[in-house]
From Swiss-Prot:
Its EC number is 3.1.21.10. Binds 2 Mg(2+) ion per subunit. The RuvA-RuvB-RuvC complex processes Holliday junction (HJ) DNA during genetic recombination and DNA repair. Endonuclease that resolves HJ intermediates. Cleaves cruciform DNA by making single-stranded nicks across the HJ at symmetrical positions within the homologous arms, yielding a 5'-phosphate and a 3'-hydroxyl group; requires a central core of homology in the junction. The consensus cleavage sequence is 5'-(A/T)TT(C/G)-3'. Cleavage occurs on the 3'-side of the TT dinucleotide at the point of strand exchange. This is Crossover junction endodeoxyribonuclease RuvC. GO terms for molecular function: crossover junction DNA endonuclease activity; DNA binding; magnesium ion binding. CDD domains: RuvC. It comes from Caldanaerobacter subterraneus subsp. tengcongensis (strain DSM 15242 / JCM 11007 / NBRC 100824 / MB4) (Thermoanaerobacter tengcongensis). Homodimer which binds Holliday junction (HJ) DNA. The HJ becomes 2-fold symmetrical on binding to RuvC with unstacked arms; it has a different conformation from HJ DNA in complex with RuvA. In the full resolvosome a probable DNA-RuvA(4)-RuvB(12)-RuvC(2) complex forms which resolves the HJ. Its cofactor is Mg(2+). Keywords: Cytoplasm, DNA damage, DNA recombination, DNA repair, DNA-binding, Endonuclease, Hydrolase, Magnesium, Metal-binding, Nuclease. Its main location: cytoplasm. It is found in: Cytoplasm. Mg(2+) 2 binds at E67. It catalyses: Endonucleolytic cleavage at a junction such as a reciprocal single-stranded crossover between two homologous DNA duplexes (Holliday junction).
Length: 165
């Protein structure tokens, strides 16, 4: 199974494509799509959309896994992240790829085994599970890979129970 994990952000959108086969993870590609704060928001969203569309076309994931919104006191931030999630989901759906959403708690639980794990613990497990030399930077990239790993673990468990996604 090939999964594209996305950590949505307007300035930095983290992405990571992971192959999961025979209970082993292989990182295919990972990185960040960045936009400049001085540019019109509509163009920034378009840049992120086109970047994701290109990644999906090139690496052909079967699934897109994206982090769900979490509560933030800054309503402007929540709205902007919601817009980025919207274009991310649209890029996947327009490419015929199924989308799954996971809360930060679900991601931590799946990757570390503890839903209240610290960010550093999650990043370290991403490094270990993907057999990487170092923790991917920026943090958004490690977070995106964690979301992809979360889907693989969740799907694997459901398949064992006979409820494969």
């Amino acid at each position: 199974m090939r999964v594209l994990g996305i950590d949505p952000g307007i300035a930095t959108l983290g992405y990571g494509v992971v192959e999961y086969k025979n209970n082993k993870f292989s990182p295919i590609v990972y990185g960040a799509i960045t936009t400049d704060a001085g540019v019109d928001k509509a163009f920034r969203l378009y840049t992120l959309y086109k970047g994701l569309e290109d990644i999906i076309k090139l690496y052909r994931p079967e699934i897109v896994a994206i982090e769900e919104l979490f509560y933030n006191k800054n309503s402007k931030t929540v709205i902007t992240i919601g817009e980025v999630r919207g274009i991310s989901i649209l890029a996947a759906v327009n490419s015929g790829v199924k989308v799954y959403e996971y809360t930060p708690l679900q991601v931590k639980q799946a990757v570390v085994g503890y839903g209240r794990a610290e960010k550093q613990q999650v990043q370290q497990m991403v490094k270990v599970l993907l057999n990487l030399d170092e923790i991917p930077k920026p943090d958004d990239v490690a977070d995106a890979l964690a979301v992809a790993i979360c889907h693989c673990h969740s799907n694997n468990m459901l398949e064992r129970l006979g409820y494969g996604r």
